[in-house]
């Protein structure tokens, strides 16, 4: 599974299949469970009738469960798109963070949980060629369907630990907002929801799907960061 010293609890899920031959593992997708308790989430993710899973689940107290081996395709992303690729289960590792979500009392992610995520993510990144711009949330890759891990998730702190990216705010916005969102990686069939997904990740203080000046400056800063990455 991995070669690290992390304490990981094996809780196998039957909901997985083979990755396409030769497909790189070059994405890390973060979710929240969106269920009342971690026990509820673990039960669903390991129940074949629901046909949903992730590679890992992290409880609020920091316990890490491995549900699907990284070599296999877990079923967590659903209909998804990022940087020209679709069907992202094939190329990603999925981590579920226990959190009630917006339907059951959304709340901040505890420190123990975030520390466990940082340790697990760093371990994953040492073993797979995942660029920082491919560390994303479920809402980034499915903006019309999902809003997790949501506006309370601390992407900035994670990026400062070497997991994902965080831009500097530009002084002006992009010339074309749609093109800018595409450059970052978003599918823009629904412009407002794509912009809201960007806000959840990079400007979470106000998520309304409207191109206000502050959002545009953060968007331009993200474009500039992505372009420097090549």
How would you describe each model-predicted region?
Residues 3, 9, 86, 106-230:
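Basic/polar, cationic surfaces and motifs that engage anionic cell-wall
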Residues 1-133:
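Active-site-adjacent loop/helix surface patches within enzyme catalytic domains
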């Amino acid at each position: 599974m991995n070669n690290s010293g992390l304490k990981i609890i094996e809780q196998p899920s039957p909901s997985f299949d083979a990755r396409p031959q030769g497909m790189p593992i070059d994405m890390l997708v973060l979710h929240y469970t969106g269920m009342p308790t971690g026990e509820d989430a673990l039960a669903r993710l390991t129940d074949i009738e629901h046909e949903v899973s992730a590679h890992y689940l992290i409880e609020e107290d920091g316990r890490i469960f491995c549900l699907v081996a990284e070599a296999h395709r877990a079923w967590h992303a659903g209909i998804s798109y990022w940087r020209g690729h679709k069907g992202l289960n094939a190329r990603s590792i999925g981590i579920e963070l226990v959190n009630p979500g917006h339907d059951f009392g959304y709340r901040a992610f505890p420190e123990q949980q975030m520390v466990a995520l940082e340790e697990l993510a760093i371990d994953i990144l040492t073993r797979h060629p995942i660029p920082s711009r491919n560390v994303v949330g479920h809402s980034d890759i499915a903006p019309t369907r999902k809003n997790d891990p949501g506006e309370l998730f601390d992407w900035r702190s994670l990026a400062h630990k070497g997991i994902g990216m965080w831009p500097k705010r530009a002084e002006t916005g992009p010339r074309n907002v749609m093109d800018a969102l595409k450059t970052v990686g978003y599918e823009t069939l629904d412009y407002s929801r794509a912009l809201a997904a960007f806000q959840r990740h990079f400007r979470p203080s106000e998520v309304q799907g409207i191109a206000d000046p502050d959002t545009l400056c953060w968007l331009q800063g993200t474009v500039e960061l992505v372009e420097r990455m090549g």
